[in-house]
Amino acid sequence: MASKYNTKVYCRQALIGGNYGLLDLETFIPNPDYYSALLWHRLMGKGVLSIDFSGSSFLRAYAHCSKHKSGVSILLINLSKSTGFSVTVRNNLNIDLAEVSVLKQTVSWYGEKVYDGSERREEYHLSGKEGNYLSRIMLLNGNPLQLTEDGEIPELSPVLTAINSPISIAPLSIAFVVFPNFEAKACA
C-alpha cells in the first residue's frame, strides 16, 4: 500500500509520554515497540516495493530495498492469535502463503533467476514473551531484548537461514527478513 500511494515517511506519535511512547516515561527503558521501530530504521530502505498476494487477512507484508546494502528487506506481520504462516518469496517478490501445517516444497526464485540455495538470508523475529502480545518483554528470535549492563541497546542479531526455505511466522509476531543481493529492478 505504501508503494501504491507513494508513501515516503513513517511517523510515530510519541517518543516519550502520551499513551504509549517508545520509551518508558519514568525509566526511559525502551518499550517493546522501540525494537520494531529500530529494526525498521536499520533494515528498510527508501525504495518501496509493491507486493501482491492473496491469502489470509491476518497477514501483512511490506517490502523495501534494503537500507545499506544491495537486496530487499521484507516485513511480515501476523495478526492471528492462533495461526502461523509459511511464506515463500519467489520471482519479483510474488509471495505465496500457506498455513504452517501445509508446508510444501516449491521451486525457489531469487530475484529474477532460479537460485541454488547456497546463500543465506537474515531473519529477525519479534514476539512478546510467551506469545503474549501485551508483554512488556520483547523477544528477538526467542531471546529477551534487555538493555546491557551499561544501559546500551542490545545487539540485534539475525538468524541466518537458507535463502530458498519458507519463512515461518508465528501467531502475533512480526518478522523482518533481509534477502542480500536480491535482484529487484527497482533497487538497482
Predicted segments — roles?
Residues 1-188:
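Substrate-binding and catalytic surfaces of secreted/luminal carbohydrate-active proteins
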